[in-house]
Every structure is written in C-alpha cells, then in structure tokens.
C-alpha cells in the first residue's frame, strides 16, 4: 500500500507542476505587426497628444513604463490603451496612468484591460497636464499601445 500512495503522490505532483507551467504565449511576431500597423495609421484627431508602445509582461521592467512630456500643457479628456492578446486564452494587462502637472505627479489611475487589440479608454476628466506616465504589467509578454 505504501508504494501505491507514493506513486499517487508523485503523479499528483507532476500533474500539479504541469498545471502551473501552462502560460499563455502571445505570438510576438503578430503582436509586432499589430504595433507597426497601428503606428502607421495617421492620427487626424485634433485632440491627439501623442502615443507610445510598451513591451509588457508579468514583471515591471524599464520597457513596461513610459513618460510622455508635452512641449506645452494640454487638456486631456482620456487616454486610450490597447494591447495584443492570444487566440487561445484571455490575456489581460493592469495599466496605471499617472498625470503630471506643474505641481508634480498625481495619484495613479489603475485599470485592468483585456488584450484584444481594441482601445480601452481611461477617462481623465479634461485635466490640463504637462505629461503622462503609463505603466503596465500583463499576464504574459505582449505589446501595449497608449494614445
């Protein structure tokens, strides 16, 4: 009986480890094509202030945060974020937007967004800002675009 219990524990441990190793992978070549296509699209919105692309993943890195400083103060109504996901499983990103004024950085606005290549708006109430800090982490490595 002891050997059967030992085998059951060993098999259970292997199954548990296999379950933990299952991480959704984003096709980074397809994600790069998506970023390139989005960047090549002309932005003709009169309220457009800028855009940035972040390489995000499960950990904070230098490539998962960007600060956009504007030449002159601008009034922002929203910031749109979009990230590329996976066809097999849902990929999400936690996005933090911090507004920068002449008084310093404000409190971060944090949103969880689905990485479905569609824009998700973060409302900033028409505030006048000198810059924006966007930071994100995602459930797996992907690209996030902020405009």
Protein language model annotation of sequence segments:
Residues 21, 82-84, 114-116:
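Sequence contexts marking disulfide-bonded cysteines in secreted/extracellular proteins
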Residues 88-106, 144-147:
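Short, surface-exposed beta-strand/strand-loop-strand elements in extracellular ectodomains
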């Amino acid at each position: 009986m002891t050997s059967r219990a030992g085998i059951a524990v060993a098999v259970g441990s292997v199954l548990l480890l296999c379950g933990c190793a299952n991480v959704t992978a984003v096709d980074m070549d397809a994600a790069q094509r998506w970023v390139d296509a989005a960047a090549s699209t002309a932005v003709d919105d009169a309220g457009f202030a800028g855009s940035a692309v972040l390489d995000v993943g499960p950990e904070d890195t230098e490539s998962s945060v960007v600060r956009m400083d504007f030449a002159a103060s601008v009034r922002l109504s929203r910031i749109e974020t979009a990230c590329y996901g996976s066809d097999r499983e849902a990929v999400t990103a936690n996005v933090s937007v911090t507004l920068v004024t002449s008084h310093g950085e404000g409190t971060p606005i944090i949103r969880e967004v689905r990485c479905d290549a569609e824009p998700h708006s973060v409302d900033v109430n028409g505030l006048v800002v000198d810059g924006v800090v966007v930071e994100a982490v995602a459930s797996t490595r992907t690209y996030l675009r902020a405009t």
